[in-house]
């Protein structure tokens, strides 16, 4: 493609395989940005750089028409037959991604409501979570971890259950660990307690779970090496940052712009 530039080519003694990638460097240029808007962008980027962001799967994961997840579920339930194994796995992966995104949206909402409403108001929205209201409010961040959460060492490392909430809150604040969300399937570590109840709301029945390979994915992520600059003469706002593998720059853009990029997808490459 004429808009793709290959910066360098070199040999390596090992072949590149799935899992070898550590992360990606991104450069993004926004056009027609006014000076006041650039100031807002700078402040939003500083906030994201400080607090991190919810590590959703980007809209690209779900296909041009946003129906890949539906096709994946149909395959698992025997309502759609696709013989190509790679294509079949692709659609099932989109279904797993949708489950993760829905769960993550709920957890972000729970954390937000715990800080915006008093205990009585919160209990009306989430009566089964009223007993952990104090724990949810004990954190200053945007995402509150819960006893029974499956935590992961960040940016690489094993997963474990959160048992000592106070200690893990400190480690989360230091970016040593982050909460993880489930990639639905068999043979994975599930959340425990109330946290597990929330997780199970989004999971299919055991028969469907057994047909998928499960794992965990970081629910929270951080920008690295963030740089940004405003070119007032051309009204361009440039930013660059690094993300670990599996994280989407488009998700960061949606967080910055507070809009769904899917609505603008045909014009993003222009």
Regions found by a protein language model. Give the residues of each.
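Non-catalytic, substrate/partner-engaging modules appended to enzymatic cores
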Residues: 1-270
């Amino acid at each position: 493609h004429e808009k793709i530039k290959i910066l360098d080519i070199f040999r390596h003694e090992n072949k590149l395989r799935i899992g070898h990638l550590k992360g990606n460097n991104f450069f993004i240029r926004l056009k027609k940005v006014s000076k006041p808007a650039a100031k807002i962008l700078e402040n939003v980027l500083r906030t994201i750089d400080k607090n991190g962001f919810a590590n959703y799967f980007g809209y690209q994961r779900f296909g041009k028409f946003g129906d890949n997840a539906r096709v994946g579920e149909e395959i698992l339930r025997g309502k759609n037959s696709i013989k190509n194994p790679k294509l079949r796995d692709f659609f099932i992966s989109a279904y797993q991604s949708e489950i993760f995104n829905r769960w993550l949206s709920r957890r972000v909402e729970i954390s937000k409501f715990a800080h915006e409403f008093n205990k009585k108001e919160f209990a009306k929205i989430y009566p089964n979570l009223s007993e952990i209201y104090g724990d949810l409010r004990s954190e200053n961040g945007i995402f509150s971890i819960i006893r029974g959460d499956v935590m992961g060492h960040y940016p690489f490392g094993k997963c474990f259950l959160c048992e000592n909430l106070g200690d893990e809150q400190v480690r989360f604040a230091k970016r040593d660990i982050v909460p993880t969300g489930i990639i639905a399937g068999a043979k994975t570590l599930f959340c425990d307690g109330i946290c597990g109840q929330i997780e199970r709301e989004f999971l299919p029945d055991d028969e469907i779970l057994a047909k998928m390979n499960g794992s965990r994915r970081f629910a929270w992520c951080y920008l690295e090496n963030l740089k940004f600059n405003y070119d007032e003469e051309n009204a361009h706002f440039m930013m660059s940052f690094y993300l670990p593998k599996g994280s989407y720059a488009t998700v960061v853009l949606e967080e910055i712009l507070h809009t769904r990029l899917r609505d603008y997808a045909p014009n993003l490459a222009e």
